[in-house]
């Protein structure tokens, strides 16, 4: 009789079933000025018209509700907090929650839309509510961690922020630069250019170079997608250029984008990075986004615990307070060192990628000439 073992080899299947049953929380934030296609991006990503074309125009009250799609949890369907709308003089914020079920695997998706960034006459401090919202979610997670078993925690932390930039080949606004810089310190950030069909090929390249230059000069750290080797030649790093469709429920025409001069088919536009970006985020990098969010959360948690200890009267002696300040100073120095090293790695990576493109182009030309 052949030895069948004790069943250890079946543990991956048990883990898989457990993971499918528990599901995963995925929280995405879109940020930018009005009219750049943030809602259209989310609608096309989730495959249905779940968000209105402009959800910020007519909020009926403090809670602005949209119909949920694929909602399977009664708590979320009936809970008024599952739809939240906030408006102030600087920006508008809408939070919507959905359930997506695919092949018996459930994903709890929370979409946070931030609109109106840079649209005001005075935009000073418009990034503060965004930073506060991200940190409030960290604080909520920390409070739950103190009270509950970690597996029972509802994760509201933002896993990825897509920052929508205007399709302008010559300029990136100071408000966008400052907002991206503040967000990148506490959250995974990917800059994208909305409505990029307004740009010609040469303008698109100018826009890309300008944004890359700004990100480098301002030391804005962006999330680097894991890209397959065969895709690295044809795909570059962020910013990504997006053309989203007008998604309508029940529309069988392919959800194309209609213009006065005709119809455009986004899936046939070679320069449209939408499909590549969504596939990279969801299918290939979702778990890594959650893991890197843990790093941002641990940094926040360390600061909060340190401040809470230091603020208690009589909790620390003079030596302890001095030591705490030294540790905090060392952490800041280490963070600056990490940013500098990361920047050097980015520069080296760009250099080798340019060499790869040069060699590939040279090889292709030689092959053409020889034939």
From Swiss-Prot:
Q: What is the lineage of its organism?
A: Eukaryota, Fungi, Fungi incertae sedis, Microsporidia, Unikaryonidae
MF (Gene Ontology): GTP binding
From what superkingdom does this record's organism come?
Eukaryota
Which species?
A: Encephalitozoon cuniculi (strain GB-M1) (Microsporidian parasite)
So what family is this one in? Belongs to the TRAFAC class TrmE-Era-EngA-EngB-Septin-like GTPase superfamily. Septin GTPase family.
Which cellular component, as a GO term, is one annotated location? septin cytoskeleton
Describe, as the record does, how this protein assembles with itself and its partners: Component of the septin complex.
Q: Specify where the region named G4 motif lies, as residue ranges.
A: 194-197
Chain positions covered by the region annotation G3 motif: 113-116
Q: Which PANTHER family match?
A: SEPTIN
Q: Which InterPro entries match?
A: G_SEPTIN_dom (IPR030379), P-loop_NTPase (IPR027417), Septin (IPR016491)
Instruction: Give a short account of what the protein does.
Output: Septins are GTPases involved in cytokinesis. The septins localize to the site of cleavage and act as a structural scaffold that recruits different components involved in diverse processes at specific stages during the cell cycle. Septins are also involved in cell morphogenesis, chitin deposition, cell cycle regulation, cell compartmentalization and spore wall formation.
Signal peptide (from-to): none
**Positions that bind GTP:** 32-39, 116, 195-203, 257
Protein's recorded name: Cell division control protein 3
User: Quick one: where's region G1 motif?
Assistant: 32-39
Gene Ontology biological process terms in this record: cell division
Q: Which PROSITE patterns match?
A: G_SEPTIN
